[in-house]
C-alpha cells in the first residue's frame, strides 16, 4: 500500500489540520498555493538544489561508525551526518526552501521561533543570504542556555527577541512568533522550524527535510546492497526524524524508531515525552499529541536539550504511531549525556545533545540485533553549542 498523507485538509488521520484565526487563513492558503506551484516549477527546484549542494554542502556522508558498532556489539551503525551541513544541523535544509518560497511570494521579511538556537541561526543565515529582514523569537530561558547562538544570530543581522511569557521556552517563542506574523502578515513569511503548525507547514517541512532520508536510502543501498533493518532519530517537534523516516515509509521491512526526551524520567514531571505521556489537543494551529494537565492546560516540557523541550509533536508522528508504522521510545538526560561522551570517545564526533538521545537508543537497539543487520541513525547536529552546558554539568557532578 502506498502511503498518502496528508489529505486535502491537511489531516494525517485525526491529527494535523488547520486551526488558525481568520487573520492567518489567507496567508496559510497563499503559502499552500505557492508551495504546490513550486513543486512543479523546474526553475525553483533547480535553484533549491543549487543552494543545497553549493551552500549547505549536500549530500552529507553516511558514515559507518565502526568503533561505536564494536562497542554496541551487534548491528552495523551508520550515522547520517547532518552535523556536517553549513550551520551544523539539519535545520538549514528547511530554511533554504522556505526562504526561496518567501521570495517567490514577494515577502522580504521572515520571522521564526527557536529553542536550541539552531533553527534561529539557520533562518538568520538564509535571511542574510537572500537579503531579508529577520526577527527571531526565543524563550528567555533558552536565551540564557544558548547565549552563543544568540550572538551568532545577531552577527548574521537578525533581531533576537527574548520572550518572557509563560515558561520562557520554545512553546512561548512559537506563540509570540505567531502573534508577530498575524500583525505583519502582508510582507512577512513565518519560517516554521519543525513539522508542526497549521497545514501546510508540517508537509512543507517534511518535504524539505526528506532530503535526509532520500540520500540515506540511496547511500545505504550502495554500501550494503540492501535497505537498513532500522532507522533511528531523535524527536522534539520531529523534523529530522520525519526527514529520515518519510522516504522509507513504504519500505515495510525498515523499522522506524523515534526517540523522545525523558528528561529526569517519565515518572517525574520533568520530561518532554509527548508520544508516551501526551493526549490529543490543539497546539499552535494543529491537532496533535500534547503534554497537558487534567484541565487541558499545556504542561511545561523539560529536557537537558533545548531543541527537544516542546510539549507537542508533529501530527504525522502521532499518525505513524497509530498506524504502527513507527515506534517511539524515550531517553533520559543522564543517558543522553552518556551517549554524548561515548560518541566523542569512540568516533571523535561531538554530537548535539538532541542527537545524543538517538545515539543512546541506537546503541541499545544495535546490541539486540545481529551483526549482519544494519541501522541508520540521524546525527541531526553537532554539539559545539552544548559543550559549555555539559562542562558545567560534569564539573557540578565532580564537585558534589
UniProtKB/Swiss-Prot annotation:
Cofactor: pyridoxal 5'-phosphate
Major enzyme class: lyase
Gene3D superfamilies: 3.40.50.1100
Chemical reaction(s) catalysed: (1S,2R)-1-C-(indol-3-yl)glycerol 3-phosphate + L-serine = D-glyceraldehyde 3-phosphate + L-tryptophan + H2O
Keyword Lipid metabolism tagged: no
InterPro entries given in the database record: Trp_synth_b_CS (IPR006653), Trp_synth_beta (IPR006654), Trp_synth_beta/beta-like (IPR023026), TrpB-like_PALP (IPR001926), TrpB-like_PALP_sf (IPR036052)
EC number: 4.2.1.20
Gene Ontology MF annotations: tryptophan synthase activity
Domain of life per record: Bacteria
A single GO cellular-component term on record: cytoplasm
Pfam families noted in UniProt: PALP
Pathway: Amino-acid biosynthesis; L-tryptophan biosynthesis; L-tryptophan from chorismate: step 5/5
UniProt KW Amino-acid biosynthesis keyword: yes
Residues with the N6-(pyridoxal phosphate)lysine modification: 91
Swiss-Prot/TrEMBL keywords: Amino-acid biosynthesis, Aromatic amino acid biosynthesis, Lyase, Pyridoxal phosphate, Tryptophan biosynthesis
Cystine pairs: none
Family: Belongs to the TrpB family.
Record text on subunit structure and interactions: Tetramer of two alpha and two beta chains.
Its biological purpose: The beta subunit is responsible for the synthesis of L-tryptophan from indole and L-serine.
Name of the protein: Tryptophan synthase beta chain
